[in-house]
């Protein structure tokens, strides 16, 4: 065992037996290597592990040096919204579909992770968004997002009329089905499907991408990540929501605004030494193959 990582957390919500197999393999392998291992409580229960140290995501964030998330991008997003609050590095083993954020191949995870544990990895910080539903600047509801915050109707699709203020200065008004406010991490997710630009992860920028706007002049906008975005609504309805990473929904009531800003903390994401963002774009999204 080396001194790069001493305590390692195993995280993820397995949806099929192969993911559980990876969790069990990882746990037993790390134990034989002499690491202190904390297993997320649900995983330990499903694997029926005995005499094992378990914890919540928050406890793993407080106690571990590294969290290994086994699953797809949904698992990664759900775990890292909590883990980002703590001084912990995070890496993913892909047991989902796309696996854009989970770098390690499950068939070669031991060797790849062994190299990472020896200190051979690339580290980067990814910022999150904080979304608040407010009434007269009094916070009512709050959540965070790794990928994006989306304004959308609640149960029935319909057009929304709203105004966007950037740093309390009017920017534009819009009639559309909603608005996607995305981080660089999320620029290859929902935002990309809506026609938004791809932002490399190190950019300090936020994109605002209209969803099915009523006019042809409505285009995506890229702003500095230090800016604060305020959404105001012209026709007060009780069926609007904002969703964070398509996992958490916050209702918007009459007379309420939405404030979106960069979080005060970052996700400490790490990758294998041979990681390339542009290669990931090519292999995962079929982006721009080499011609010669």
Curated annotation (Swiss-Prot):
Q: Which domain of life is it from?
A: Bacteria
Instruction: Supply the name of the protein.
Output: NAD kinase
Taxonomy of origin reads: Bacteria, Pseudomonadati, Pseudomonadota, Gammaproteobacteria, Enterobacterales
What is a biological process (GO) this protein takes part in?
Answer: NAD metabolic process
Q: Which cofactor does it need?
A: a divalent metal cation
The catalytic residues are 73
What exactly does this protein do? Involved in the regulation of the intracellular balance of NAD and NADP, and is a key enzyme in the biosynthesis of NADP. Catalyzes specifically the phosphorylation on 2'-hydroxyl of the adenosine moiety of NAD to yield NADP.
| Gene Ontology molecular function, alphabetical | ATP binding; metal ion binding; NAD binding; NAD+ kinase activity
Q: Does the keyword 4Fe-4S apply?
A: no
Q: Which reaction is catalysed here?
A: NAD(+) + ATP = ADP + NADP(+) + H(+)
The broad enzyme category this protein falls into is transferase
Q: Name one GO cellular component term.
A: cytoplasm
Q: Which residues does the record give as NAD(+) binding sites?
A: 73-74, 147-148, 158, 175, 177, 188-193, 247
């Amino acid at each position: 065992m080396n001194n790069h990582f001493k305590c390692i957390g195993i995280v993820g919500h397995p949806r099929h037996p192969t993911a559980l197999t990876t969790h069990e393999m990882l746990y037993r392998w790390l134990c034989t290597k002499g690491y202190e291992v904390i297993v997320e409580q649900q995983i330990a229960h499903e694997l029926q592990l005995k005499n094992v140290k378990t914890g919540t995501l928050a406890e793993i964030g407080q106690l571990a040096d590294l969290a290994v998330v086994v699953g797809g991008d949904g698992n990664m997003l759900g775990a890292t919204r909590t883990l980002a609050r703590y001084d912990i590095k995070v890496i993913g083993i892909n047991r989902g579909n796309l696996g854009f954020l989970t770098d390690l191949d499950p068939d070669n995870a031991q060797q790849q992770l062994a190299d990472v544990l020896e200190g051979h990895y690339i580290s980067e910080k990814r910022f999150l968004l904080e979304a608040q539903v407010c009434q007269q600047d009094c916070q009512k509801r709050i959540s965070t997002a790794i990928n994006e915050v989306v304004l959308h109707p609640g149960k029935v699709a319909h057009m929304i009329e709203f105004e966007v203020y950037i740093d309390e200065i009017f920017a534009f008004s819009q009639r559309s089905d909603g608005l996607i406010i995305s981080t660089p991490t999320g620029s290859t997710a929902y935002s990309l499907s809506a026609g938004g630009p791809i932002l490399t992860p190190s950019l300090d920028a936020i994109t605002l991408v209209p969803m099915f706007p009523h006019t042809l002049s409505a285009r995506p906008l890229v702003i500095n990540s230090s800016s604060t975005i305020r959404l105001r609504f012209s026709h007060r309805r009780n069926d609007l929501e904002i969703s964070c990473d398509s996992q958490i929904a916050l209702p918007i009531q009459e007379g309420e605004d939405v404030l979106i800003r960069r979080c005060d903390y970052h996700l400490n994401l790490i990758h294998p030494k041979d990681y390339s963002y542009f290669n990931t774009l090519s292999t995962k999204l079929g982006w721009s193959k080499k011609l010669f």
